[in-house]
Regions:
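Short active-site oxyanion
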Residues: 31-35, 65-67, 104-108
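Short beta-strand scaffold positions
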Residues: 4, 37, 70, 88-91, ...
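Acidic, PIN/NYN-like endoribonuclease modules and their adjacent C-terminal/linker elements
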Residues: 1, 38, 42, 98-133
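Short, well-structured N-terminal submotif of metal-dependent ribonuclease cores
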Residues: 1-37, 48-61, 125, 131-133
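A general structural signal for well-ordered alpha-helical segments in protein cores
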Residues: 19, 42, 56-59, 76, ...
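Acidic catalytic patch
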Residues: 64-96, 100
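Alpha-helical scaffold domains
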Residues: 58, 68, 76, 81, ...
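His/Asp/Glu-enriched, well-ordered alpha-helical/loop segment
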Residues: 45
């Protein structure tokens, strides 16, 4: 299962260096394993659309291909233990990913954030930074 962090989603939409490789990884994951993320992705991407002046419809189309997970009490509790090493929103993403991880469906975090990738790996999750490919 591929957990999509906002940093990678935005990289693919904003046409930044590495956007083509990132878009390819996202499309491959969508076709083979599926994409999952916290519903926080919606808020962060809408904010970026406003900040970067691009059409919110692009965000809506992108998010339509991602299974979104609610931020429940279990996510908040887990994220609270991660805020010493991560920013709050990254802690919510990592908490969500760790709660989804299981032996039958291991989670790999797709992120452009080195600190989040390291934190994911230290908790037994896979992590891919498309710019390292």
């Amino acid at each position: 299962m591929i957990y999509l962090d906002t940093s990678v989603a935005l990289l693919s939409l904003l046409g930044q260096p590495g956007a083509d490789e990132t878009a390819r990884l996202i499309m491959d994951a969508h076709a083979t394993e599926g994409l999952i993320s916290s519903c926080l992705l919606t808020v962060e991407m809408a904010r970026a659309a406003h900040r970067e002046h691009f059409d919110i419809c692009v965000v809506d189309e992108f998010i339509a291909g991602v299974e979104l997970v609610e931020i429940g009490p279990d996510v908040i509790e887990r994220a609270s233990t991660l805020t010493g090493e991560l920013k709050s929103l990254d802690a919510i993403h990592l908490a969500t990913a760790t709660l989804l991880d299981n032996p039958r469906h291991p989670v790999t975090v797709l992120t452009h954030d080195a600190r989040l990738a390291d934190a994911a790996r230290s908790r037994g999750l896979g992590a891919i930074n498309p710019l390292d490919s």
